[in-house]
Amino acid sequence: MPIINKTMLITYADSLGKNLKELNENIENYFGDAVGGVHLLPFFPSTGDRGFAPIDYHEVDSAFGDWDDVKCLGEKYYLMFDFMINHISRQSKYYKDYQEKHEASAYKDLFLNWDKFWPKNRPTQEDVDLIYKRKDRAPKQEIQFADGSVEHLWNTFGEEQIDLDVTKEVTMDFIRSTIENLAANGCDLIRLDAFAYAVKKLDTNDFFVEPEIWTLLDKVRDIAAVSGAEILPEIHEHYTIQFKIADHDYYVYDFALPMVTLYSLYSSKVDRLAKWLKMSPMKQFTTLDTHDGIGVVDVKDILTDEEITYTSNELYKVGANVNRKYSTAEYNNLDIYQINSTYYSALGDDDQKYFLARLIQAFAPGIPQVYYVGFLAGKNDLELLESTKEGRNINRHYYSSEEIAKEVKRPVVKALLNLFTYRNQSAAFDLDGRIEVETPNEATIVIERQNKDGSHIAKAEINLQDMTYRVTENDQTISFE
């Protein structure tokens, strides 16, 4: 199914019901026309990071179901799957074969060798400091071979996630076979997880290394195109990187919108939001929440450093059951630039403020992605957080089918479902159309979307001082109650 301009639900295979069958039933029964696509977070056998340390992309974790269940989902919704282009599990057959056979392994070039990467007498501390890291030490891991020798491999993320060498032909063959298999099983859009880390080059920070990163991106796009799929690079960094990618006619993420929207709702000032909406490309997926924390680094220079600090402080002040320690190493937080909270709790579990945040997202340029906890206006799950000591689990509640049936009766959830059903069905949100943004006063923003020929005009007038709104289409008032 081609990508369509309808809201994409982000979910794990076992977060809305116990498995893929229940997920399929629950989306159909409770979300209806509010959902047009599904980002199915990693459902492959994995040894860590909630699926992001995959063992084998050709299998579905049996706890979730099988490929028939995945294909069944794809009959009703366009689908996005994750491809961890930077790494694979050290429990994979590729790693084990390399460990057993060393230089005789067919996969010896699949992994990026840390020792061979550096010239003699390097890396120096200066070299290590230059690397854009996700940990406070050199991103390497020891590998002990069956022949008794010891070497080191690049290891950017968790201990289970061993980096691939994307410059080698064996790796490109692996990428090709993986993408072909994903597309054959219903994948329409391939999310390239942690894409900016994939290329490493001497005397750089090893993050979004140009021009090599463009060569890799184009190669992967060409591979996907053969199977009729498209790609979405996932990169958390300065917004100008997203704009560069958009200029090359790729889909991009809007990871800045979450913090810009929080700042606007906390401060009752719309100037930063208005400027951002005017700048944003149409060929993008918008987010307020994902399976990770709320990104801070993405909003630099859209908000000033003072405004970022203000927003972070307000989140901890007005947020419900939010604590700074939940985003620290004590709770296994890899990324100091993310805040762990559901978006609903970041707004103090306030129904009206939360609905306005989603209204802004619905009218923003691009296609909305809504995380499953966000669709159900979910609160911070402190029980799961404390039982696992995993900070991101505060926003990873497991909903039973019975819980979902109860949650969708809440007025705020009903309103959200009506909002995104409207967004999916209205012609005004044409990605080839236009957006106009006005700010009648400091606290009021008027966002107007119209289709290419101007026959459908939707307008949202939002006042962040008194937290009111009015939505019209072709001058007819639209209600979401």
Curated annotation (Swiss-Prot):
Active-site residues per Swiss-Prot or TrEMBL entry: 193 (nucleophile), 234 (proton donor)
Coiled-coil region(s): none
SMART domains: Aamy
Residues that hold sucrose according to the record: 49, 87, 191-193, 234, 291-292, 335-338, 392
Location in the cell: Cytoplasm
Known EC number: 2.4.1.7
Pfam families linked to this entry: Alpha-amylase
CDD domains, sorted: AmyAc_Sucrose_phosphorylase
InterPro entries with a match to the protein in the record: Glyco_hydro_13_cat_dom (IPR006047), Glycoside_hydrolase_SF (IPR017853), O16G_dom_2 (IPR045857), Sucrose_GGa_phosphorylase-rel (IPR016377), Sucrose_phospho (IPR022527)
GO molecular function list: sucrose phosphorylase activity
Catalytic activity: sucrose + phosphate = D-fructose + alpha-D-glucose 1-phosphate
GO BP annotations, alphabetical order: carbohydrate metabolic process
Record keywords: Cytoplasm, Dental caries, Glycosyltransferase, Transferase
One Gene Ontology cellular component annotation held by this UniProt entry: cytoplasm
Sequence similarity: Belongs to the glycosyl hydrolase 13 family. Sucrose phosphorylase subfamily.
Role summary: Intracellular catabolism of sucrose. Being intracellular, probably not involved in synthesis of extracellular polysaccharides.
PANTHER family assigned: SUCROSE PHOSPHORYLASE (PTHR38784:SF1)
Something else known: Some earlier publications concluded that the product of the reaction of GtfA with sucrose was a glucan, because of its insolubility in ethanol.
Identification of the protein by name: Sucrose phosphorylase
